[in-house]
């Protein structure tokens, strides 16, 4: 029984510091990532529908999404700079319990200002997992457990689990329609039940994190955990990633659903199906990204897979029918996320191990702050026009980001690419 539990990553008595302990940590993180991704997968799609059901307008939806990202950014910044003082397990369990409290709050509160406060303090994610206080902690742990040659593949698996499970979770966005039809309850009550389920997933994640061992792979970092050696490059990357994130904030899943809902009268069930296939394509692209990165390098993979996806994004609003818009959306999804594992691997590769938590936080937080402006602007644009101006602007900014990233990082290579 112990052997089976160790294989599955469920054995708490793995030898500290050994290979089995490292595998245990990674498996626990993958399991927890999957639980959170499943919840984020449907909540990111149902959030705008729920807020519209409560009587809020597109601008209100944008404001709440913006405040959610701002809150995530502040929390991630605090955690990133102080993570080296605590065991990661403690911080991850606390974050999971906060996730549970967030779901409970959205399930029982319907007034705008209290919801806004919960959005700022909590973990609700309008980007289906793209911005989260969990990520810097998990990235730092994974980068310590993996060798340089395996690091990109490890982050690809991490991203694969998140994206694949989020895609399956997106299918659950059709559950409120089913609950209304089968149970005869109102749409508001059905949506509130989905937020209760989100809270339950938060508790499940807390139990999974609690199983992490308090050993060298998750213990305190040295006191010099802030940026020193890599400060200049990390801040350059943070600025570039912020430009990309600002564009991404205009087209978060919640805002895309809002545009499709307004433009084509999209149902929640169909939205879930669309984003399931989009997530599925993105999931398998992570594995392909590893192969491409081994051939052409991390930076080239980030740039030359991202460019065509941004062009597809610009073209979506010009499509005359929902079918054509969905086709381009899926084509974009097949390419747009290849930079996720490669970007994370690149940042973790070019900084010293003791600076990784701070680097992960500093490159994540500006992304969160920058993307937070996007929903507010997108909501304002969509409140005056059903044309997809947010998509056009987002695609243009992302193309600019790709070109600037290529110019800035072309000579800074990770260890595995240095001959």
Task: Please tell me what each predicted stretch does.
Residues 34, 102, 112-133, 324-338:
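Hydrophobic core of transmembrane alpha-helices in multi-pass small-molecule transporters
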Residues 75-87, 177, 285-298, 382:
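Helix-to-loop junctions at the C-terminal end of transmembrane segments
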Residues 19-70, 233-241, 245-276:
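Helix-loop boundary and gating motifs at the non-cytosolic
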Residues 90-105, 300-315, 395:
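Structural signature of the two symmetry-related core transmembrane helices
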């Amino acid at each position: 029984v112990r052997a089976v539990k160790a294989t599955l990553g469920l054995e708490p008595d793995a030898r500290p510091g050994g290979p089995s302990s490292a595998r245990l940590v990674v498996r626990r993180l993958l399991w927890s990532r999957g639980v959170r991704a499943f919840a984020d997968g449907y909540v990111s799609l149902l959030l705008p529908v729920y807020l519209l059901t409560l009587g809020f307008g597109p601008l209100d939806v944008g404001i709440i999404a913006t405040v959610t990202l701002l809150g995530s950014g502040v929390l991630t910044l605090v955690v990133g700079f102080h993570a080296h003082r605590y065991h990661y397990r403690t911080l991850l369990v606390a974050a999971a319990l906060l996730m549970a409290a967030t779901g409970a709050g959205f399930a029982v509160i319907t007034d705008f200002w209290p919801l806004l406060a919960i959005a700022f303090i909590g973990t609700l994610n309008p980007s289906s997992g793209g911005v989260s206080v969990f990520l810097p902690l998990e990235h730092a742990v994974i980068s310590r457990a993996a060798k340089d040659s395996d690091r990109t593949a490890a982050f690809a698996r991490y991203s694969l689990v998140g994206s694949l499970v989020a895609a399956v979770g997106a299918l659950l966005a059709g559950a409120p329609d089913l609950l209304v039809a089968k149970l005869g309850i109102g749409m508001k009550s059905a949506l509130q039940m989905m937020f209760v389920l989100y809270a339950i997933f938060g508790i499940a994640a807390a139990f999974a994190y609690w199983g992490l061992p308090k050993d060298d792979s998750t213990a305190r970092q040295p006191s010099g955990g802030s940026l020193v050696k890599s400060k200049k490059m990390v801040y350059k990357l943070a600025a570039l990633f912020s430009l990309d994130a600002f564009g991404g904030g205009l087209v978060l899943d919640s805002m895309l659903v809002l545009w499709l809902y307004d433009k084509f009268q999209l149902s929640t069930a169909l939205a879930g199906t669309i984003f399931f296939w989009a997530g599925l394509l993105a999931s398998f692209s992570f594995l392909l990204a590893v192969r491409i990165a081994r051939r052409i390098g991390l930076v080239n993979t980030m740039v030359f897979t991202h460019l065509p996806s941004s062009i597809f994004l610009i073209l979506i609003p010009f499509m005359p029918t929902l079918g054509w818009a969905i086709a381009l959306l899926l084509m974009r999804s097949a390419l747009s996320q290849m930079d996720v594992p490669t970007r994370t691997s690149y940042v973790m590769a070019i900084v010293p191990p003791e600076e990784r938590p701070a680097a992960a936080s500093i490159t994540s937080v500006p992304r969160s702050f920058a993307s937070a402006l996007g929903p507010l602007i997108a909501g304002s644009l969509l409140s005056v026009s059903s044309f997809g101006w947010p998509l056009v602007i987002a695609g243009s900014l992302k193309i600019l980001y790709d070109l600037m990233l290529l110019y800035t990082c072309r000579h800074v290579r990770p260890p595995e690419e240095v001959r």
